[in-house]
Amino acid sequence: MKAKPSHQATSMSSSLRVSPSIHGYHFDTAARKKAVGNIFENIDQESLQRLFRNSGDKKAEERAKIIFAIDQDLEEKTRALMALKKRTKDKLLQFLKLRKYSIKVH
C-alpha cells in the first residue's frame, strides 16, 4: 500500500505567510512616524503620571518625577528606574514570604 502524497504546501493558510511581497504588496515605510531619541519629549508630567497610573503602576508619581528630573543624565535615570523596579519586586517578595509564614503559623 502506498501513501498518498501530501499537498500541504500548496494549501497553506494565508495567515501563515509572513511577507506581503508574496502577493505583490509592499510595506509603505515612508508613511511611518520618524523615531525620536526621547519618547517623553513632548509630554508633560501629569500626562505621564496618568499614563503610568492607568497601566496599574502604584508608583506612577515617583516614576514620572524620575523621568522629568532635569539634573539627571540618561544613565542616572535608568539606574533610578531600575532601583524603583527592584524595590517594588523586593517588597512583593517580602509580602509573599510573610504571607507564607503567616499561613504556617495559623
Curated annotation (Swiss-Prot):
One of its GO terms (molecular function) is Notch binding. GO terms for cellular component: cytoplasm; cytosol; nuclear speck; nucleolus; nucleus; plasma membrane. Expressed in liver, expression levels decrease in regenerating liver. In bone marrow, expressed in large progenitor-like cells, cells with ring-shaped nuclei and, at lower, levels in hematopietic stem cell-like cells with round nuclei (at protein level). It comes from Mus musculus. This is Transcriptional and immune response regulator. GO terms for biological process: apoptotic process; cellular response to heat; endothelial cell activation involved in immune response; negative regulation of apoptotic process; negative regulation of Notch signaling pathway; positive regulation of non-canonical NF-kappaB signal transduction; positive regulation of protein kinase A signaling; regulation of cell cycle G1/S phase transition. Monomer. Interacts with NOTCH2 (via ANK repeats), the interaction inhibits the nuclear translocation of NOTCH2 N2ICD. Interacts (C-terminus) with CBY1 (C-terminus), TCIM competes with CTNNB1 for the interaction with CBY1. It is found in: Cytoplasm; Nucleus; Nucleus, Nucleolus; Nucleus speckle.
